[in-house]
């Protein structure tokens, strides 16, 4: 059997908005884009639940998260930096 190459995992940069859970943080990732009709620059955000083994992150910290296998019902990301 031949091993299949795994595709590159997605990496996103965001800010920690909650650290109240054990080994889990909520990271808000913002993206900006031009509105298709009006051309105005619009900012949209999305929250991701990420695994944080060390538990040393504080609210407001800037982190990188990487896609991973499902760790729970909501967690599909882990903190890498």
From Swiss-Prot:
InterPro entries: NA-bd_OB-fold, Ribosomal_uS17, Ribosomal_uS17_bact/chlr, Ribosomal_uS17_CS. GO terms for molecular function: rRNA binding; structural constituent of ribosome. Keywords: Ribonucleoprotein, Ribosomal protein, RNA-binding, rRNA-binding. GO terms for cellular component: cytosolic small ribosomal subunit. It comes from the Bacteria. CDD domains: Ribosomal_uS17 (cd00364). One of the primary rRNA binding proteins, it binds specifically to the 5'-end of 16S ribosomal RNA. Part of the 30S ribosomal subunit. Belongs to the universal ribosomal protein uS17 family. This is Small ribosomal subunit protein uS17. It comes from Protochlamydia amoebophila (strain UWE25).
């Amino acid at each position: 059997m031949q091993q299949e190459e795994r595709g590159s995992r997605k990496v996103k940069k965001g800010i920690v908005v909650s650290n109240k859970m054990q080994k889990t943080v909520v990271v808000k990732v913002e993206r900006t884009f031009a509105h298709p009709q009006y051309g105005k620059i619009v900012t949209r955000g999305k929250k991701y639940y990420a695994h944080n083994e060390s538990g040393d992150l504080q609210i407001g910290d800037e982190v990188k998260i990487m896609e991973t296998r499902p760790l729970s019902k909501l967690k599909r990301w882990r903190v890498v930096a």
